[in-house]
């Protein structure tokens, strides 16, 4: 299984998102689907244009912004591979949030 870490922003976002009806689905995507190797076929993952390594995962009305851990980060954590979840945002806020990644 891959390691999935949450940034402080993602932890704050997730706390808010878990209070919504989509909360259980978001939690499943982060804890189970992203950690699975290989990812489930129904996991909707797309690269974010113009952002380099950042990816977007669709989870109901929410979008999860993440990137793969680089080799140094994996080595420091003692894992072969993993991901850093940076934000968990409502889809209507995604474009505003993405300005920081470009």
Task: List each model region and its residues.
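A generic structural signal for beta-strand entry/edge sites
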Residues: 1, 52-54, 80-82
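Arg/Lys-rich, positively charged N-terminal/basic patches that mediate binding to nucleic acids
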Residues: 1-31
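Short histidine-centered beta-strand/loop micro-motifs
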Residues: 15-16, 46-47, 56-58, 75-78
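A short, surface-exposed loop/turn module that caps and links secondary-structure elements
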Residues: 31-58
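Enriched for short, Lys/Arg-rich terminal
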Residues: 58-63, 67-102
């Amino acid at each position: 299984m891959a390691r999935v870490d949450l940034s402080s922003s993602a932890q704050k976002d997730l706390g808010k998102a878990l209070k919504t009806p989509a909360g259980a689905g978001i939690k499943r995507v982060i804890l189970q689907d992203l950690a699975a190797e290989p990812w489930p076929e129904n996991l909707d993952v797309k690269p974010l244009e113009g952002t380099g390594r950042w990816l977007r995962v669709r989870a109901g009305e929410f979008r999860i912004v993440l990137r793969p851990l680089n080799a140094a980060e994996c080595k420091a954590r003692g894992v072969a591979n993993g991901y850093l979840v940076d934000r968990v945002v409502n889809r209507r806020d995604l474009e505003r949030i993405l300005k920081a990644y470009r």
